[in-house]
Structure formats: C-alpha cells, structure tokens
C-alpha cells in the first residue's frame, strides 16, 4: 500500500498502566477509560484496530488491591472489582465514583448499555428516525465500546481479521464530564480528519455523457469565463452505466 494511505498509529499502552493475569489484561488508559481483555489462550492484541489507534496515554494514578475474591482497581473516577476469571456479570463490575446515580452508575459485565447514542454509518434508505451505534457518554455516567470484532491494522497499511474468542472492551466512566470523555475518545481513535480546503470551494458535477475531449473543453471554457471551480466530478460515467 502506498505510504500516503497508511494511518499513523501508536497502539502500545504504557506497561506501567497494565494489570495482567494468565487470561486477562486490564489497561488503565486514563482515570476514566479502562481497557478490558480476556483470552483463554492468554493472547492479547497490541496492534492498532479499526477503533483504537492511540493507546499511548500518559501515565495516570491508580491503585490495585488484592482480595480473597480477586482484585480491585481504584482510580479517581472508577472502582473496578474482578474475580480474575472469565468475564461474567457476577465476576466483573465497575462503579463510577461521584454519586452520579443512586442505582444506575454501577455496571456489571453483560448488562445492556444505556448511553446517549453515537453515530450511524449511513443514511441510505433512511426515512425518519434510525438506530444509532453506542456512544461514549451517558446519563448513568458510563458507556462501553466493544472492540472484539474490529479488524486489525497491519504495519504495511492493510487489515486482517482478529483472532476469534477474545474479548476486548473499552469502559468509559467519566460521570457527567462529557467533554473529557469525548477528548479521550478522540485521542484513542484519532482526530477526525478535516475536510481539505479545496473541497470547500465550488464543485462542478453534471450527469451527462461527456467524452474526455468535451470535458476538457468545458474546463477550458470555465477558465476563459473566469468561473472558479476547485473540484470537477465526472458523476456516473467513471464506470459502466449501459450494462443491459
């Protein structure tokens, strides 16, 4: 793949932010952003994925407490309790600190997420309201993004499917600090690319059966008439249209 099409990534988290057992790995990316991985084979993913480009967050404070039942992890924002076994509703929970809600700021693994919604991939065939993917902010103070099925980005710019059966989750526990949640989301996933300047100028697009010669003549005519166009679109005739 050409170099200009490759995506810059820094997928390795600081080793000091990792709490790991034989079959699990918990990465404290920030005080409110926790990565949760579980693999029966003890194999974890350090490469970038379609979701996560940058896991190299700066060091943050956390505390690990070992108990008879497993481990507890405390940060300024969340309190995680885990029995160090396969993820389950009884064995993995995270409480968002700060008295966000009396009953709803505690998440157990497997519970349905009630957030404020994210985005939709396309508006094709939409007619009215459409379902949205999960977002990263919630009135309950937390949300969860499941990265278990994302494609992996390779160093040469191509992608490949992930190994099946590995759980890879990102827990966002920011309470009502929505701005900070979105800030860390954008760091993890990469900034949204800005539109190139030329795309903000005038466009010419017409569904018309041009030839190469007639299209070039049209561009020259625009130039002669001092009509400023920064983008010229061939419309549908860049591919076959008469296929019957």
Regions found by a protein language model. Give the residues of each.
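Ser/Thr/Asn(+Pro)-rich, low-complexity disordered segments
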Residues: 18, 224-225
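Catalytic and substrate-binding clefts that recognize carbohydrates or anionic sugar/phosphate headgroups
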Residues: 64-199, 206-207, 212-213, 219-224
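Aromatic- and carboxylate-enriched substrate-binding clefts and catalytic-loop regions
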Residues: 95, 103, 228-244
């Amino acid at each position: 793949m050409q170099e200009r099409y490759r995506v810059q990534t820094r997928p390795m988290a600081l080793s000091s932010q990792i709490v790991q057992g034989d079959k699990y790995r918990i990465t404290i990316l920030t005080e409110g952003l926790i990565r949760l991985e579980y693999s029966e084979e003890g194999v974890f993913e350090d490469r970038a994925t379609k979701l996560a480009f940058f896991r190299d967050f700066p060091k943050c404070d956390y505390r690990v407490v070992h108990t008879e039942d497993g481990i507890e992890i405390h940060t300024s924002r969340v309190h995680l309790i885990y029995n160090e076994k396969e993820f389950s509703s009884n064995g993995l929970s995270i409480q968002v600190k700060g008295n966000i809600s009396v009953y709803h700021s505690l998440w157990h693994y497997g519970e349905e997420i009630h957030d404020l919604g994210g985005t939709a991939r396309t508006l094709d065939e939409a007619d009215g309201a459409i379902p949205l993917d999960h977002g990263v902010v919630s009135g309950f103070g937390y949300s969860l993004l499941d990265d278990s099925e994302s494609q992996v980005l390779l160093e040469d710019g191509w992608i490949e499917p992930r190994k099946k059966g590995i759980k890879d989750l990102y827990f966002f526990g920011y309470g009502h600090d929505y701005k900070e949640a979105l800030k860390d989301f954008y760091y993890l996933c990469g900034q949204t690319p800005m539109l190139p300047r030329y795309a903000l100028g005038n466009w010419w697009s017409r569904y018309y059966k041009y030839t190469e010669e007639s299209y070039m003549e049209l561009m020259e005519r625009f130039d002669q008439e001092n009509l400023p166009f920064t983008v010229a679109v061939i419309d549908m005739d860049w591919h076959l249209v008469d296929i019957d």
